Each structure stands twice: as C-alpha cells, then as structure tokens.
From Swiss-Prot:
Presence of the UniProt keyword Transferase in the record: no
Keyword list, A-Z: Chaperone, Cytoplasm, Protein transport, Translocation, Transport
GO cellular component, one term: cytoplasm
Superkingdom as given in the UniProt entry: Bacteria
HAMAP family the UniProt entry points to: SecB (MF_00821)
Listed GO biological process terms: protein folding; protein tetramerization; protein transport
Coiled coil: none
Subcellular location: Cytoplasm
Family: Belongs to the SecB family.
InterPro entries in UniProt: SecB, SecB-like_sf
SUPFAM superfamilies in UniProt: SecB-like
Species name: Brucella canis (strain ATCC 23365 / NCTC 10854 / RM-666)
Subunit note: Homotetramer, a dimer of dimers. One homotetramer interacts with 1 SecA dimer.
Protein name: Protein-export protein SecB
C-alpha cells in the first residue's frame, strides 16, 4: 500500500508535488483583419452575411513543466461572392503544469488550456471586427473536449491506415 496521495507525484528531489496549472503569460502572436471591400462593404445589408469560423489548437513543450499552447481563430464573413472581412488571431499562453500524471497531459493541454485562453481570444476578435466597422463578432463557446476527441480519432485512423 502506498502512502502517496491520489494526484500527487514525486518531483526530481523526491518531494511530492501537488497538481497545479498556472498561466505564466498570454500573448497575441499574430492578428490580422482585412476588409477588402471597405467602405462599400460597410453599408447595411438585407440579410446577415455567412460567417465561417475555423479553430485550431497546438501545444509545444518549452521545458519539463512549461508549455506553449496556441489557439488559432480564423473568421471570414461573406455576402454572396463578396468577402466582407477576413480576420485571423493566433493567441498563445505559456502554462506551467506540475504534478499531473502523463496520461492526463494531452487532455489538459488541448482542452483545459485553450478553454482558459478562449474568452480573451474571443474578445480580441470581437474588438477587431468592431474596429473594422462591423458589428462585433461574438464567437460561440467552443467544445474543446469534442475537438480533442475528434483529433484523437483522426490520429488513430491515420495510424491504422499506415499500419
């Protein structure tokens, strides 16, 4: 029987480390907003434009405990064949993760970390579209757990094809 508490791990010095997730920094890596048809595209419209949104999450280790998690949001508003605006945000966060078992790291990096970044990224996109002369684009909350499950299923399918 072990006297190690659930969720605690040993650090390199043999001392136990409580599970923790800390945001060390958040930053805009890239932000672009294009309104190719302005000012004509800013006129009132009879119907709402079609808005396509793409979301991507990547994570890279910076050290044994620090990770760079990057959330990419792309939005394009189209009315017929006219592009009203196109915006892209690459928003990152540096996270310090300690005391988390290895089997929980991927879900933490690809679900919890982007969930923490999303409200800030959403506000930046809303401000960019508003500052571009359009109503603020308020992106609906994103189900990062579903995105992660889909990503894992795609990777398993790819590895099965390669085998």
């Amino acid at each position: 029987m072990s006297d190690k508490a659930a969720g605690e791990t040993k650090n390199g010095n043999g001392a136990t480390t409580e599970p923790s997730l800390n945001i060390l920094a958040q930053y805009v890596k890239d932000l672009s907003f294009e309104s190719p048809g302005a000012p004509l595209s800013l006129r009132p419209r009879e119907k709402a434009p079609s808005i396509n949104i793409n979301v991507n999450v990547n994570a890279n280790p910076l050290s044994e405990t620090d990770f760079d998690v990057v959330l990419t949001l792309e939005a394009k508003a189209v009315d017929g064949k006219d592009i009203l605006f196109n915006t892209e945000l690459v928003y990152g966060g540096v996270f310090r993760i300690q005391g988390i078992p290895q089997e929980h790291m991927l879900p933490l990096l690809f679900i919890e970390c982007p969930r923490l970044l999303f409200p800030f990224a959403r506000q930046i996109i809303a401000d960019a579209t508003r500052n571009g002369g359009y109503p603020p684009l308020m992106i609906d909350p994103i189900d990062f757990a579903q995105m992660f499950q889909q990503r894992m299923a795609e990777e398993q399918a790819e590895s099965a094809v390669k085998s």
